[in-house]
């Protein structure tokens, strides 16, 4: 009895419009590309959904056998009062939202939250500061102390705090920082519609400094901000042509907040997030694809499809910076119902 379709090897090849091929068998064998074109990526995004899910799962199973998922916790250490004008963000001083500037949380309080996150099952603790850029001084010294404390707890430590200098990146590396998050948000073509106070090149320069310091890179974007599918492909192209690829790629869905310029935008179709996650997995096989903000509007079924097709991390806890997130118990049940194991490093 023949159990394996003899045509399966050939069906693992995807033919692009320019007559070139993407061989999924070579991806499984470790052939990691950094020369993707936007056109190729858009063709993957536009595949019939069943084909896309199947092909993404081929890659996902190869690099993540057993569907293990990392649980990460995120704390807003400095909330509100940011001078940037990001159109989606309730923490911007340019947007009239209910978020008020709050003082920086003290070091020991942050470490208490890190201990609680570890006790709840997280093994990565992320800390956010609503800043345009890091400035030297007491606040930065406290950040370094927090990083050291989180690492001493046995957790991975990630920081997101805006632009950074070479010296600051080096000091964070010396403190033991695991990862620095600095998202691109959207495509280069759509970027000017989202923010005017920081250039796309500023963001890429920050990523370069993080990489040069020996810190792993966490970089992704947001969908649902009025961009086209071509914009999504362009964003993924920028990420997938970085060499090496970002170790962590958070994929967010816009959470439209009253008082921001994007308050009236409709929620995305959940399957758009599934497509984005699956495509990211195909083109960045070794990266950790993080299912991030906007999970609540996806529903259980779409979240499970994301986990099946490429996501191998979720943010865990009832708040993501200033937006709501599923309750811990709900996430535990979701993972259990899907037969997914957490955690891994």
UniProtKB/Swiss-Prot annotation:
Co-factor(s): [4Fe-4S] cluster; [2Fe-2S] cluster
Keyword field: 2Fe-2S, 4Fe-4S, Biotin biosynthesis, Iron, Iron-sulfur, Metal-binding, S-adenosyl-L-methionine, Transferase
Keyword Metal-binding: yes
GO biological process: biotin biosynthetic process
Co-factor binding details: Binds 1 [4Fe-4S] cluster. The cluster is coordinated with 3 cysteines and an exchangeable S-adenosyl-L-methionine. Binds 1 [2Fe-2S] cluster. The cluster is coordinated with 3 cysteines and 1 arginine.
A GO term, aspect molecular function: 4 iron, 4 sulfur cluster binding
One Pfam family it belongs to: BATS
Protein name: Biotin synthase
Record's subunit section: Homodimer.
Residues the entry annotates as binding [4Fe-4S] cluster: 82, 86, 89
Role according to the record: Catalyzes the conversion of dethiobiotin (DTB) to biotin by the insertion of a sulfur atom into dethiobiotin via a radical-based mechanism.
Domain named Radical SAM core: residues: 67-295
Encoding gene per record: bioB
Entry-linked NCBIfam families: bioB (TIGR00433)
EC numbers for this chain: 2.8.1.6
Similarity section: Belongs to the radical SAM superfamily. Biotin synthase family.
Catalytic activity: (4R,5S)-dethiobiotin + (sulfur carrier)-SH + 2 reduced [2Fe-2S]-[ferredoxin] + 2 S-adenosyl-L-methionine = (sulfur carrier)-H + biotin + 2 5'-deoxyadenosine + 2 L-methionine + 2 oxidized [2Fe-2S]-[ferredoxin]
